[in-house]
Amino acid sequence: QVYRGMDIGTAKATPEERRLVPHHMIDICDPDYPFSVAEFQERAAALIEDIHRRGKLPFLVGGTGLYVESVCYGFSFSEGGADESYRAELNEYADRFGNASLHEKLREIDPASAARIHPNDRRRTIRALEVYRLTGVPLSEHLAGQKKESPYECCIIGLTMNREKLYRRIDE
């Protein structure tokens, strides 16, 4: 929901909904901007602090589980930086052999991350492989050691939707 123009399939609040209730971090960057979970966490924490200062109750709505948990549990992101040449190599591999083959490489070194990341989510698959290459430690182990006592009083609610209904809604 942070990306401009990415409205289909994101359940992004409509302009009318945004007029009724203040929303933050919607349409804040272009789709080609590499918006990371660490940046999300930093921006969300600043907004939460600002909203609290104004005597209001913030709601963190939407996003992936990792993004929400990073804010609620104060994850620290020190998985070794980035390796652009390795990312390019993995992208070329996926272009040639497919996302499923790339995902299988992840399953071999980090079954827990592979179980959590969809085989077609190339970006997250590559990031998990990159973290392992840079640190020698699977991403799942990095994440397992990061959950802390929440700095906030959180109430986490998850919603699901019937798959057929979801696809119909996306098609509309």
Give the location of each predicted region.
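Phosphate/pyrophosphate-binding catalytic cores of soluble transferases and nucleic-acid-acting enzymes
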Residues: 1-172
